[in-house]
């Protein structure tokens, strides 16, 4: 295609050009050169055009140079490849070669982008690797530029034409100079000075010829820069091999392992110091000192004889004096898995200074190293090492723990008492007595957290005298909880739950019949809320938390916990689920307390006898059965404080005057049934239907104000007790509150009239 372009772009006389082309090919075969006439005719006018693409333009420092041109070509090809990845394309151009020089013309617009005369072109470089690329350097002094061009066809014809162009120009000038020389020779006799000028001109011509020989050069660049980093990778590999050689020579010299050129940690195998692990360890030694044992890197040496790790190089002199045994002992038998694992242990130690203080604040002080290493180990690794504490004493029996009061790098104060009492504490920790169960460990954990929170010294070891023989912490250990205590501690209190004072939270008991019951419900109205019962037991669960005791502000709910459970006949047919509030939602009538729980489910140990008698004397009819709840509540406080009815609801007060007139008339009617009189039935019905709903709803809602008022105020009587029936007289409130729970065997509520007479207290009613 270039040949077609050449013939079409030459100025006229194609017949004349065709004639010399044939002999030129023959002459090329013969090795003869092209004639000047042919070259002049070829580059005359517009010259020759070649279709190409402009790779790029780069500024270069020198006018010529193969290496410079190669570097510039590589740079421009890389930039072109980057632009191609972004969708950019090279500029399509025409390269015009003529006697005037080189012209770069835009293919689309035909505008001459660049024009360089022959005398401005200082160097032309061809690419021996990429046969479709070449470049040339042009510009004045200090303004040299390298133009990289990629031709559509082979670049060799274009470079040959450039050579021919320079050659023909040189020949033309030479001929002109010869003509001038002949003319000057004819005139030389006239002026001898002209002979000197002729010599100077000849010297310049020779110099021009020499420059023409240095005009062209060769460069080598890859044809395609799809992988431009190939040569760089080779250089990096060579450099890496050189580094390996240097490091091997350093590694073989044992006297250079002083903490600067190699890691100061004992290693199972030699490693190059430029690795990340050893480089990090070398950075730890900010003040390296010569190693007294240059052969300690021997992988076959015993780990006990290894030098101190680099972690101790960070330790100050005071800390080293404080713990003299830590530097002379092996650091957890050396790094078992190499430097990486040992660095992981060091980082664990740093993190455990703040993250794992629970073990430090525990009830056990730090024991001696022998028992600790011999017993408290897991998988051959000591417990302190697993927790990140590498400050272990030597297993040598002659090496003791550090002196008392001296600080350790972790800030732990190891008292002399801990080393003396170490064997006892270890025996307790490993073989705890039977009393030390999971609750005991829970208390120990609470104690340790307490020390972490409020102790002056988090890491201070606990004196042995404060430890109980059973392995549980003594009572004075929880003294910080006394800040919140407002009442005496419970006799069977456990932990900070009892020390909370007036907060009526029932601690869990180990007995099988006392589940946890939330007592604020009982403090509101002791008789209204019934403790939950498990289905497997026949006795009521109120024995664990007696509401009557809580009402009188006793700090512990275990005052009557030792009382024996009632017979199994007292087990109601309708049992409430454990730890549940009394709810009326699943019942048909929300005001029937008998549907919530039968009177037999109420603990007779928790309430006085008047309350229990009033519960048992309720009539069998469903409407009157609503009364036992309110009567139980009112009778309990009426017998204790007759004047305590100041805060009774208005609904109660509506019928208070009518109900208070009948109790004095009832004492002689103990044998009568409550259903015999219409007035008592009316009174009980009216009392249960009108007086209870408001109070019962209040108990279901658990008003916070009512809870606080009921806890702090004295007991109040409920004067409505006599309206139920003639048998429910005022003396019912004075019966023995404990006689019913121990002696009654009434299995049902139907026979309540007879059972109430049989179990009445022989004592009279002093308030009747």
Swiss-Prot record:
A motif (DPF 2) lies at residues 298-300. Residues 1-16, 303-317, 325-334, 367-381, 724-755 have a biased composition (Polar residues). Residues 45-196 form the PID domain. It is found in: Cytoplasm; Cytoplasmic vesicle, Clathrin-coated vesicle membrane; Membrane, Clathrin-coated pit. The modification Phosphothreonine is found at residue 673. Changing residue 393 to A: Reduces phosphorylation, reduces mitotic membrane displacement. The modification Phosphotyrosine is found at residue 170. This is Disabled homolog 2.
